[in-house]
Design a protein with these regions (language model features):
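N-terminal and secondary-structure boundary signal
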Residues: 4-8, 18-163
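Compositionally biased, low-complexity intrinsically disordered regions
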Residues: 10-12
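N-terminal signal peptide c-region/cleavage motif recognized by signal peptidases
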Residues: 14-16
Length: 163
């Protein structure tokens, strides 16, 4: 049986001044380990919390399984959020993307929000060199706090990806 090693990275965007970047790693890939890493950050999720993930392509088994992330999502009282992809595949169109979300079991355990299902918003980029704004799903404005869960992956579009 082919073993697939997933590297989980829990990212939390916190604005700090003159702070050293800390990286938290675990050898244990489990629901409890995810909660321990999150708690080590020392930052409590407040308000309307979303948990950004990649729900994976329909035929691809490499994504963060709902049962792996369930304890953390429940602990922060989060809503799973995802966006459609810019490349052709099972998540490029809204209906197909919802089919993948269902097939992979996310909607059976969590509230799920496809952030760019209906609209998008532009967020200005400060001190821009190449981009004046970033386009994100319009539903992002509905949340106060985001926890981002990533798994390491390579993309045929030209590089490594995240959530």
């Amino acid at each position: 049986m082919k073993k697939i090693i997933m590297t989980l990275t829990l990212l939390l965007a916190v604005i700090t001044v003159n702070a050293q970047t800390k990286v938290y790693l675990t050898k244990e890939i489990s629901p409890d380990a995810l909660v321990r890493i999150y708690n080590a950050l020392g930052v409590k999720a407040k308000g309307r919390v979303c948990v950004k993930i990649s729900t994976g392509e329909g035929s691809n088994p490499n994504y963060l399984k709902p049962t792996l992330i369930q304890k953390l999502v429940d602990d922060v009282d989060g809503v799973i959020v995802e966006n459609r992809t810019a490349y052709p595949g099972d998540r490029m169109e809204t209906k197909d993307h919802w089919d993948v979300i269902h097939k992979h079991g996310f909607d059976s355990l969590f509230a799920v929000d496809l952030m760019d299902e209906y609209d998008e918003i532009r967020i200005p980029v400060k001190d821009h060199t190449h981009l004046k704004y970033d386009i994100v799903g319009g539903h992002l404005a509905n949340y106060d706090f985001m926890v981002c869960l990533n798994h390491f992956k390579g993309h045929p579009m030209g590089g490594y990806g995240g959530a």
